[in-house]
């Protein structure tokens, strides 16, 4: 066991450096994770730009909240509680719930009042320091949310657990999509593709995914995962295309997972059916939506729901879907980078690095 662990630390906006931290001793109630694979998503891009401060991120912090690793050390009480042993591959949710506030007690721990999260919300000045997955080791707090990865599932495959879990929660558990429905997914990134899988699992009849010309490969992947239609909005009128596909009835559910762009929010009002249509807003914009026609919501009786993340009710099904081998999820894993190249991984997710990225990972031991 090394005495120190290198880790990728955000020290300021657009400033990242690799630092070393002591590997902590473990008691009866906590554990130590030997990191294998860290998924990088749009939230990491926001943290890199400094936009995470509005939701509680504080510099300096170790990046990495989509974490897969091997239990290296674990206390007796922690092993009993999490039902895992040394050598087990596990997935970790990013929240560290307090377990006492009304949100935790109600099962809504993503909204925990203490707002502690791996990979963003705990500074490196807080012992035992290793609070993010972009490190060779990560500390497992007694309140960490730990899930055993099914046997036979690789670290690379398991790293897709959060995008798929997000899709399950948004499409199935919140929106209630089911057989016979038409679902439009705006944005074919990893979150949108997770929604495709969730919609397919729910038995949705028509799954329509929209994107730009630069998303051609992602749209192909959407088809491979189960989308019935894909639309390049640079070449086709999305509203007209959805009207054609649905015989003018439009979509039962529209999910906007696009990051930064506000136009899809306004367009969603025209894509969704009247009287009972639902819109899920899952893509952060970090700015107001101009000319948002609120009267459309009233007159057409549309429901709009904001969503963020996943929970235990969607994590377990996500891991089981991955283990089933039903979907070619390997198509999502497009780029991997070593720890020293964490910044390049983030830039790739933000569209300023390697091209044609879908799901990007950091491999801390590479």
Residue ranges and their predicted role:
Residues 1-7, 221, 236-237, 244, ...:
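C-terminal hydrophobic helical "lid"/dimerization subdomain
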Residues 11, 22-23, 58-64, 126-131, ...:
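Short Gly/Pro-enriched turn/cap motifs at secondary-structure boundaries
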Residues 24-38, 52-105, 144, 150-152:
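Glycine-rich beta-strand-centered segment in the early N-terminal region that forms part
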Residues 43-49:
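Cytochrome P450 core scaffold surrounding the K-helix E-X-X-R motif
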Residues 98-186:
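NAD(P)H dinucleotide-binding glycine-rich loop of Rossmann-like/cofactor-binding domains
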Residues 136, 150-236, 240:
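Mid-domain Rossmann-like dinucleotide-binding core that forms the NAD(H)/NADP(H) cofactor-binding site
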Residues 174-179, 208, 217-220, 224-302, ...:
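Glycine-rich cofactor phosphate-binding loops and adjacent beta1-alpha1 units
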Residues 278-280, 292-331:
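Rossmann-fold dehydrogenase core element
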């Amino acid at each position: 066991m090394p005495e120190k662990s290198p880790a990728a630390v955000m020290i300021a906006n657009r400033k990242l450096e690799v630092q070393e931290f002591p590997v902590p001793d473990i008691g009866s109630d906590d554990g130590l994770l030997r990191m294998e694979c860290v998924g990088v998503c749009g939230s990491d891009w926001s943290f890199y730009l400094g936009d995470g401060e509005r939701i509680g991120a504080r510099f300096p912090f170790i990046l990495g909240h989509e974490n897969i690793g091997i239990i290296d050390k674990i206390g007796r009480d922690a092993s009993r509680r999490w039902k895992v042993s040394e050598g087990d591959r596990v997935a970790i949710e990013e929240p560290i719930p307090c377990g006492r506030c009304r949100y935790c007690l109600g099962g809504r721990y993503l909204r925990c009042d203490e707002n502690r999260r791996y990979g963003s919300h705990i500074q490196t000045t807080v012992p035992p320091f290793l609070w993010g997955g972009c490190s060779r080791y990560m500390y497992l707090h007694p309140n960490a949310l730990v899930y055993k990865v099914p046997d036979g599932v690789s670290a690379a495959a398991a790293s897709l657990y959060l995008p798929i879990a997000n899709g399950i929660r948004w499409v199935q558990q919140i929106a209630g999509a089911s057989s016979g429905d038409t679902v439009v997914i705006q944005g074919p990134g990893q979150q949108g593709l997770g929604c495709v899988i969730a919609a397919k699992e729910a038995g949705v009849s028509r799954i329509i995914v929209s994107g730009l010309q630069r998303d051609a490969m992602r749209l192909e992947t959407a088809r491979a995962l189960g989308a019935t239609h894909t639309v390049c909005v640079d070449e086709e009128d999305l509203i007209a295309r959805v009207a054609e596909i649905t015989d003018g009835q439009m979509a039962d559910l529209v999910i906007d997972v696009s990051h930064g762009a506000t136009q899809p929010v306004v367009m969603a009002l025209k894509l969704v059916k009247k009287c009972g249509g639902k819109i899920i807003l899952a893509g952060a914009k970090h700015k107001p939506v101009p000319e948002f026609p609120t009267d459309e919501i009233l007159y057409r009786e549309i429901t709009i729901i904001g969503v963020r993340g996943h929970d235990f009710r969607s994590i377990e099904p996500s891991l089981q879907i991955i283990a089933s081998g039903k979907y070619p999820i390997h198509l999502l894993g497009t780029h991997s980078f070593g720890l020293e190249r964490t910044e390049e991984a983030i830039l790739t997710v933000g569209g300023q690095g390697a091209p044609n990225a879908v799901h990007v990972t950091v491999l801390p031991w590479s």
